[in-house]
Swiss-Prot record:
Residues 81-271 form the RNase H type-2 domain. Its EC number is 3.1.26.4. PROSITE patterns: RNASE_H_2. Endonuclease that specifically degrades the RNA of RNA-DNA hybrids. GO terms for biological process: DNA replication, removal of RNA primer; mismatch repair. It comes from Myxococcus xanthus (strain DK1622). This is Ribonuclease HII.
Length: 293
């Protein structure tokens, strides 16, 4: 079929041409668009417009991919092979762990539609992208920091701890890290923190997708364990429904007791300094510098 001439293609039904050159995105033979433009059928003109629109979208996506790979490309050209993107998910929720992911993509990796997980609202699309990343990545790993750790060392440092665990979980040692906004502590690998990195680096975007989808699945499992709180729907974030059920049903073991709405539900002072609050909740809590994975 790929050797069909333009004349032969014009003998096909327009529905077949649509399936081949729009739905399946088969490369368009030279001269086909011009032949469709000259075809007296209105449907042929509409098909030519759809093919051109698809081609323009493909060009734009290709340009977006190249732009998202500029940090990786610079490092590849310097001789680095294994570049890991690192990102986290779940800093703001009132419940559940904070989860981080690290992803090492092969040189020249492309995945249509891959972007910062916050920009991809369709959960099924995120899952599809996550499966493609896991399938094609050189290596990937996730790490987490539990609620107790969040309350002991604060959410910022717990997020860093989850990131470090993700990097340490990789099956290959990365040559360089690209990290969303921060740098990973206690890590000897050279690294670069990129503000809004999940929107500027393909590797970080991949890690963002893995962290988000992994955490969402874990929250769905917690929803089965703690029914009635809507955890599968709001993922622990402080939605009006979550705040209401927190007041009505009380605090769960998976709620972050260092977060103001949870402290309020427990009847604890919401304005306590972190050190005083941690002393209240965890009398024997280790110092921040003593925290280990």
């Amino acid at each position: 079929m790929s050797a069909d001439t333009v004349e032969q293609l014009l003998q096909c039904a327009l529905s077949e041409l649509t399936a081949r050159f729009v739905t399946q995105a088969t490369p368009v033979p030279t001269g086909l668009l011009e032949a469709l433009d000259a075809d007296p059928r209105a449907g042929a003109h509409a098909l030519a417009r759809r093919i051109r629109s698809r081609q323009e979208k493909n060009r734009a996506e290709g340009q977006r991919m190249r732009k998202l790979l500029r940090f990786e490309t610079e490092l590849w050209e310097q001789g680095h092979t294994h570049i890991a993107g690192v990102d986290e998910a779940g800093m703001a929720p009132l419940a559940g762990p904070v989860v981080a992911a690290a992803a090492v993509l092969p040189k020249g990796f492309r995945l249509k539609g891959l972007d910062d997980s916050k920009k991809i609202l369709d959960a099924e699309k995120r899952e599809s992208l996550a499966e493609a990343i896991k399938r094609d990545a050189v290596a990937w790993a996730v790490g987490r920091a539990e609620v107790e750790e969040i309350d002991r060392i604060n959410i910022y440092h717990a997020g860093l701890l989850a990131m470090r665990r993700a990097v340490e979980g990789l099956s290959v040692k990365p040559d360089h890290l690209l990290v969303d906004a921060r740098t990973v502590p206690e890590c000897s690998v050279p690294q670069k923190g990129i503000i809004k990195g999940d929107a500027l680096s393909l590797s970080i975007a991949a890690a963002s997708i893995l962290a988000k989808t992994t955490r969402d699945r874990w929250m769905a499992e917690l929803d089965d364990q703690y029914p009635g709180y809507g955890l599968a729907a709001h993922k622990g974030y402080p939605t009006p429904h979550h705040l209401q059920v927190l007041r009505e049903k009380g605090v769960l073991p998976i709620h972050r007791r260092s977060f103001a709405p949870v402290r309020e539900a427990l009847g604890l002072p919401t304005g306590s300094p972190p050190s005083a609050l941690q002393a209240e909740l965890f009398p024997e809590a280790p110092s921040r510098t003593g925290v280990k994975s």
